[in-house]
Amino acid sequence: MALNNFSIVFPGQGSQYPGMLVQYIENLPLFKSTFDKSSDLLGTDLIRLLKQGSKEDLSKTEITQPLMLTSNIALWNQISSLVEKPICLAGHSVGEYAALVAADVLSFEDALSLVIERSRLMQAAVPMGEGGIAAIIGLEEININKICSKISQNPDYLVSAANLNSYNQIVISGTKEGINKAIQECKSSGAKRAIPLPMSVPAHCMLMKGAADKFSDSLDKAKFSEPKIPVILNVDSLLETNPERIRTKLIEQIYNPVRWLDTIKSMTEMKVTTIIECGPSKVLCGLIKRISSEIKTIDLDSFDNYLNLSNAERV
């Protein structure tokens, strides 16, 4: 039975893991060809990295971001001919670039070049070990914002909400000292958990403003077209059709929070009933289930799920 009222979402940094999607690479020539193209452009053998690289190797921002774009688009190329046109698309953080490729706003080659430069600038913006991120579970956004605002009065302790992921999960980003202080204060204020996360870059906070300003030059050189599929953007969780405004919002996205909760709310208002996560892992499916029990989720991390989707769409 064909899918109806569905959308597709693309995961970002944090969903990668060693050995991911290997069954796709070994069984689907079209899928493998996307990795081959990226490997040539990057000068790095991504397939070997997936098969032999460690978790730490895959967690380096300058590797992770192009790797996630490649993985997401390899899957999109595989399923786009199987399914009808989705109601809309969205991507989490760097996953937004995959959504824009799928919507024909950017070519894959331009998106890959942009993501490589984006990751380089973000990595260079804060010296290694001086920034951090943490997940706060079970504390309301208003309380987290108050805590972060208070701590950030000292510029050495800059910290703010970076990913508004669900009703009870918010990721904060900032200086290492700011993160450590925020973790303690969030716990004292009733957070169920406050966990530092292994990320080399404190994304989506004002520490990235300088990187965003430099990145604007690269975005100005890329060709942007009107989306052929509606895309909900991270910065404001709204649909955007104007190529120049999309370009501007990609700059803003680097130092502003990802509004994932509001993105899924927007999809429910558009009568989306099924969401396919087009990338490795099941992180976004997990978040979506916590936001709405009414939405069915399908992850493509499992090769069997892809085969089931493929067979169902041919019926």
PLM feature segments, named:
Residues 261-265:
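Short hydrophobic/charged patches on amphipathic alpha-helices used for structural packing
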Residues 2-146, 274-307:
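FabD-like malonyl-/acyl-CoA
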Residues 197-200, 268, 301:
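Short glycine-rich catalytic loops that host catalytic nucleophiles or stabilize transition states
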Residues 178-179, 218, 271, 294-295, ...:
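NAD(P)-dependent dehydrogenase/reductase Rossmann-like domain
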